Amino acid sequence: MGSMKKSIQWSAVVILGVTACTPALKLTPSDADVVLARQILEAPDPGQPGSFRVQRLYYGSGTDKNRSEYRDSVAITTPTVDVSKMVSLGASASERNDYWDFTPKEMPLNARVWYPDGEGPFPLVLVVHGNHDMRDFSDPGYDYFGELLASRGYILVSVDENFINGGIRGENDARGWFLLRHVQLFEEFNAEAGNPFEGKVDMSNIVLMGHSRGGEAVANAAAFNNLTHYPDDASLKFDFGYDIKGVISIAPVDGQYLPTGRPVVIEDMSYLTFHGSHDGDVTSFHGLRIYDRMKFNDPDTFNFKSAVYVYRANHGQWNSVWGSHDSGPRSARILDLRGLIPEEDQRRFAEIYVSAFLEVVTRGDKSYLPIFRDHRVIGEWLPETMYITRFETSAFQPLANFEEDIDVTSGSEHGVTIAGDSLATWKEANLLLRSSNRANTSASQDNQGVTVGWNNRMAGPDTTVHGPTARYTLGLPAGLAADWRLSAGSTLDFMLAPTNDVPGPRKAPTSEDDEEEEEDNEDDETDAAGRGGDDDEEEEDPDVDLSIELLDSSGRMARVTLSEYGAVRRPLDTYVMRRGDREAARFQTHWEMILQTYSIPLRDFLADNRSLDVRQITQISFVFDQVHAGEVIIDQVGFSDLDPGFLGARVEGN
């Protein structure tokens, strides 16, 4: 298992569509033909319609000035609400009040509903849009979710919040509060004799879904659900406490609402977030921050979180009204739209993941869990693009998350030590986001990781001379593996991603003169980007791969190769703007640094060495033996006692 494996073909860019006035389109070549080559999961496709006939209705004020469906077509008339403590219209108040014919003291509870024709009770799913032109109504844009999910036995409610769209700020707390107020309506509908939803709503199975600002709003709602008072004005009392089982954030913002100056934390439920690389509006994956802050307080209660980065997806195509125009009507002049995946493919991905998430979270159908551990098991279902995925369960126990102190030799769990051998780079640092337009909300992932770089070649004209193989090792205290009850069914989990940097060859000075000569050689062999080169090679930097090694207290070792457990990719090239100067001004880099989760069953190490005692593991090593040089970022190293469902389908070879 020590031989070099190269399953991912790498090239810097694909150059397409060069004309006199349009710059070349730059995309990382797709590896979908390899990564998505198999269909292992045998469960039914969750993105296909179910057996229920779909019914539709509107509810609302019945007096809407601008929208006939909420004026003339409401099946249920609902009250107005006072959100003036949360919504300030500022200088636009007069214009907005004239347009809508109401103020924040009397805003409506409007929504369109898709629901199954059946007895029920059915799980309740609410979706809320984000910010957009308030006159270009956003709530119809999730019709594709409505049709699919209602046919599969869910009540899908698309909430109207267009009246707080447009040019106002500081309203994302209200967006979340509105969602809970709509949940309260369904509690009333469910109990009301003669109501179309009488007895049909499963109030013990609620999921909140939001897009853009709505993606942060659902996190706010999940937090508000457990509070008795509004954090920013305790005179406003809350009385919710609903059984919210999961939250879904689609291309969310984060940090627009900071109650008492602190970010919102979701606790003890399941979470799904996804984001497109070519998002021209929310230009960084802010859902990763919500994901990282999420807390599982009870390891014995099953919950999980999942994040997916979809290459070449944009912001607006998650909504059928918004489409490809992430920067408004003039998007084609501002954004480079040529690299986007088709909108039907983008929504097909969303249908699969959202539906599978709902099946797991509301119905306990764990046959879909493998999708979240390793997307490669559904290669035939997924649109042909590249995906970077993360997942973690409530059963994860961290050894090192690189958050607790400034000592690079200590782990997060007491007694865990860290050591490096023959490394060119070893540092812990905050991970950045590519967007630089807001320093407090857009520049950082708010998450630490460790950067490890290596070059096993020795400096000099003979490129066949190598030093000791570089490695990065976590040492476990005696008894920890036994205390954690590690077994063949446990998994070693971590996040990792290569960077674009490649250190130069190692120096091995034997004297002052030799040291100067080595430095001269290194200067000759390192290009302007800091990448090591070889005199006799013209090829691109090799694909990154490495080995993962376990050692027990008796010195028995087992090793697997990382690429067997998922693609190991350098950052994916992302150019959103048509003009290079605008791209450079808006973004720190032309890629987003997204770490991939790798989940390796300990039984795979036992397959390499049956004598390994997993109850006596003392070391975990990242061994850089597959390519001579590279650099990776590592985070969240630990063990999980996964629900067996996660391993119910696995790509052959891992």
Q: What function would you assign to each model-found segment?
A:
Residues L25-G120:
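Short conserved active-site loop signatures built around small residues
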Residues P121-G130:
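Short beta-strand element of the alpha/beta-hydrolase
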Residues T463-N609, D625-G648:
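Extracellular ligand-binding interfaces
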